[in-house]
From Swiss-Prot:
Upper lineage: Bacteria, Pseudomonadati, Thermodesulfobacteriota, Desulfobacteria, Desulfobacterales
Protein name: Ribosomal RNA small subunit methyltransferase H
EC number: 2.1.1.199
UniProt keyword list: Cytoplasm, Methyltransferase, rRNA processing, S-adenosyl-L-methionine, Transferase
Entry keyword Transferase: yes
Main location: cytoplasm
Reaction catalysed by this enzyme: cytidine(1402) in 16S rRNA + S-adenosyl-L-methionine = N(4)-methylcytidine(1402) in 16S rRNA + S-adenosyl-L-homocysteine + H(+)
Pfam family, one: Methyltransf_5
Organism: Desulfosudis oleivorans (strain DSM 6200 / JCM 39069 / Hxd3) (Desulfococcus oleovorans)
GO biological process per UniProt: rRNA base methylation
Length: 312
């Protein structure tokens, strides 16, 4: 299957980056290159675009989409969590703009064959980086029941985490759970009968999201990225983040507020002792959301939140 993906909120995200000719911009989740093409059109040929992705299929497609821009685009197969190290390896001290899109591509969900979708019956894999060893099947079949409860509750905010974990443990006593279809049926059966057909989202939605987050250490990666990225942005440069669930969005919102603070001393101290300097100005006081028209055209955009900050 060819790589298919529609970038979410591309015009708003690229506009917030303040792209201009000659700037250096990093797209830390290159995907199919939808955002990157728009960025490249605005900063090249004088500027430089750095495209990072750990999925080799995404990188291959992006290289085709961006081939017209030639050597002014640098491609890096890597994890956005290692952004600072990647810049060091390229001998680039700082950039003018950073874009991070935390969503899955349509290809990953529908065409990768890695079990991201509960609507398909595929190997229960869920790795964004196929070279990684841990799979969703490993977690489902080897984790203790208590650990499954924690994963579903912490990463999926799933109210029936205990019931679902118990059903999984019961099912795997007979045979390993190896496909996305198997897991989806187990989760649906674990739900109270009255809620299976009345819930606004499919019963398997939160469990699949939780497993994907756990397999790919998504929240840990985001934390590592946020720990260092602001130091790699030039004064006046901007960072834009597209989050697709509340856990990510809360992390980004809190970190931007922390960057904006000039002092983080406990309240009541007569004199500041932390010596913290204000690092950014928040550009989006309230997260931007897609229009109803975009959601209708691209349902994957439904939950996205876009936040931006400017380095001072």
């Amino acid at each position: 299957m060819s790589f298919r993906h529609t970038s979410v909120m591309p015009d708003q995200a690229v506009a917030l980056l303040n792209c201009e000719k000659g700037k250096i911009v990093a797209d830390c989740t290159l995907g199919g290159g939808g955002h990157a093409v728009r960025i490249a059109e605005q900063i090249l040929p004088e500027g430089l675009l750095i495209g990072i992705d750990k999925d080799p299929a995404a990188l291959a497609h992006a290289k085709q989409a961006l081939s017209v821009f030639g050597e002014r685009v640098l491609y890096v197969r890597g994890n956005f969590a290692d952004f600072s190290e990647i810049l060091s390896s390229l001998d680039i001290p700082a950039v003018d703009g950073v874009l991070l899109d935390l969503g899955l591509s349509f290809y990953q969900i529908d065409g990768s064959g890695r079990g991201f979708s509960f609507r398909k019956d595929e190997p229960l894999d869920m790795r964004m980086d196929p070279d990684q060893s841990l799979t969703a099947a490993d977690l489902v079949n080897q984790s203790a029941e208590a650990d499954l409860v924690r994963i579903f509750r912490e990463f999926g905010e799933e109210r029936y985490a205990s019931r679902i974990a118990r059903r999984i443990v019961e099912a795997r006593r007979s045979a390993p759970v190896t496909t996305s279809g198997q897991l989806a049926r187990i989760v649906t059966d674990a739900y109270p009968a009255k809620e299976r057909h009345t819930a606004k989202i499919d019963p398997a939605t939160r469990v699949f999201m939780a497993l994907r987050i756990a397999v790919n250490t998504e929240l840990e990666n985001l934390e590592r990225f946020l720990d260092t990225v602001i130091d790699r942005i030039k004064p006046g440069g901007r960072i834009c983040v597209l989050s697709f669930h509340s856990l990510e969005d809360r992390m980004v919102k809190r970190r931007m507020k922390l960057w904006e603070k000039a002092c983080v001393c406990p309240p009541g101290l007569p004199v500041c002792s932390c010596s913290k300097q204000r690092e950014c100005r928040i550009v989006t006081r309230k997260a931007l959301v897609p229009t109803a028209e975009e959601v209708q055209a691209n349902p994957m955009a439904r939950s996205v939140r876009l936040r931006a900050a400017e380095k001072v």
